[in-house]
Curated annotation (Swiss-Prot):
Binds 2 manganese ions per subunit. Pathway: Amino-acid degradation; L-histidine degradation into L-glutamate; L-glutamate from N-formimidoyl-L-glutamate (hydrolase route): step 1/1. NCBIfam families: hutG. Catalyzes the conversion of N-formimidoyl-L-glutamate to L-glutamate and formamide. This is Formimidoylglutamase. Belongs to the arginase family. Its cofactor is Mn(2+). Keywords: Histidine metabolism, Hydrolase, Manganese, Metal-binding. The keyword tRNA-binding does not apply. Mn(2+) 1 binds at H128, D153, D157, C240. It catalyses: N-formimidoyl-L-glutamate + H2O = formamide + L-glutamate. GO terms for biological process: L-histidine catabolic process to glutamate and formamide; L-histidine catabolic process to glutamate and formate; putrescine biosynthetic process from arginine, via agmatine.
C-alpha cells in the first residue's frame, strides 16, 4: 500500500527563513506523489520508504524496522543543506498483501518510476527484503543491462526458503537472473553458517570479511570494488545496518558486537557513490524500537547526507 509523504515528519531548527546558506533539509524538501511526478531531465535525489518488516518476522528476527523510514526522515531533516541538490520525498510503501513478494513487486513498480526521475534514488527500509524489491525495480528500469549488486552486510542473506524473507534477497536474485552478480563486504564469519559459505563458493559470490576491513581498506580491496563495477552496466548498492558495530547502531534487527565503524562504511561507499553506473542506494534494518538516542537513524541520515553532498 502506497502512502504519500507526511509533511509533519519534516521539522527542525530554523536558523533563518530567508538565507539559504543557513537552511536545513526540512526547509527545502519537496513532497511528491510518485504516480504523478514526471520530469523532463533527471535531477536531484528521490527518497522512497519501505515501511515493511514482514520479511524480518519471516526470518525470525526482531520486528520494528517498519518504523525505520520515518525515523530516518526526522533525523535527516535537521541536517544542513551544503550544496544545491534538490531532494524529493515520495512517501512509503506498507505491507498489506497476503504475501511479501506482492509488496516487493508494488514497491519495485514505484521505485522504477523514481529511477527515471533522479540521478540517485535512496530507498529506506524496513527489512533487508527491500534489496529484492530494489533489484526488481532495477530490472524493470534496465531490462537488458547487466546488474552488479554490491552489499555492505554482516550476512550473505542467501538463505534458502519457500518465500521471500529478509534473509533470502540475494539468493533470489542470483537464481532468477543470469545477468546479475553479487559482491558483499563485511561478512561476519561466526554469523554465517558453513552452508552459506559453501553456497557462496558454488555461485562464485565475491565477498570480503569484516576482519579484512575492520581497521582500514587495503588497495587490493579497493581494486576489487572497482573491477566489479567495471564489469557491469549498472550498479545497485545496498547497506544493511547490522554490519555496523552496535556501539554506533544499536537499533537494528540483528545487532553486531564486532561490526564495522561508520568511517569504514563511508570509505567503502565512496568507491561506489558518485560512479556514473550507480542507479540506486538502499539502507535497511533500522529498527527504532531498539534504538538509543536515535543513534541508528541519525547514522543512516548522515550516510544519506554524505551521499548527496
Amino acid at each position: 500500500m502506497y502512502k504519500q509523504a507526511n509533511p509533519d515528519l519534516w521539522q527542525g531548527r530554523i536558523d533563518s527563513e530567508t538565507d539559504e546558506s543557513q537552511f536545513r533539509h526540512f526547509q527545502t524538501i519537496e513532497l511528491k506523489d510518485i504516480n504523478e511526478t514526471k520530469v523532463d531531465k533527471k535531477a536531484g535525489t528521490g527518497i522512497l520508504g519501505y515501511a515493511v518488516d514482514k520479511g524480518v518476522e519471516l526470518n525470525n528476527g526482531r520486528v520494528g524496522a517498519q518504523e525505520g523510514p520515518d525515523a530516518v526522515r526526522k533525523a535527516f531533516g535537521n541536517l544542513s543543506v551544503l550544496t544545491p541538490c534538490p531532494v524529493y520525498d515520495y512517501g512509503n510503501v506498507y505491507h498489506d498483501h497476503d504475501h511479501l513478494i506482492d509488496t516487493q513487486e508494488e514497491y519495485a513498480e514505484l521505485a522504477a518510476k523514481m529511477f527515471q526521475n533522479h540521478n540517485y534514488s535512496f530507498l529506506v527500509g524496513g527489512g533487508h527484503d527491500i534489496a529484492y524489491a530494489q533489484y526488481l525495480a532495477m530490472r524493470k528500469a534496465y531490462p537488458d543491462s547487466s546488474i552488479g549488486v554490491i552489499n555492505i552486510d554482516a550476512h550473505f542473506d542467501t538463505r534458502k526458503a519457500d518465500s521471500s524473507t529478509s534473509g533470502t534477497s540475494f539468493r533470489q536474485i542470483l537464481e532468477g537472473d543470469d545477468n546479475a552478480d553479487y559482491f558483499v563486504l563485511g561478512i561476519q564469519s561466526a554469523s554465517n553458517t558453513k552452508s552459506l559459505f559453501d553456497y557462496a563458493e558454488e555461485r562464485g559470490i565475491e565477498y570480503v570479511t569484516a576482519d579484512e576491513i575492520l581497521h582500514e581498506i587495503s588497495p587490493t580491496i579497493k581494486d576489487k570494488i572497482d573491477h566489479f563495477i567495471n564489469r557491469h552496466d549498472v550498479i545497485m548498492f545496498t547497506i544493511c545496518m547490522d554490519v555496523v558495530d552496535s556501539a554506533f547502531a544499536p537499533g537494528v534487527s540483528a545487532p553486531a558486537v564486532n561490526g564495522l565503524t561508520p568511517h569504514i562504511i563511508l570509505e567503502l561507499s565512496r568507491r561506489i557513490v558518485g560512479h556514473p553506473k550507480l542507479v540506486s542506494i538502499s539502507v535497511a534494518e533500522t529498527n527504532p524500537l531498539y534504538d538509543m538516542d536515535n543513534r541508528t537513524a541519525k547514522l543512516v541520515a548522515l550516510f544519506l547526507h554524505n551521499f548527496i553532498h
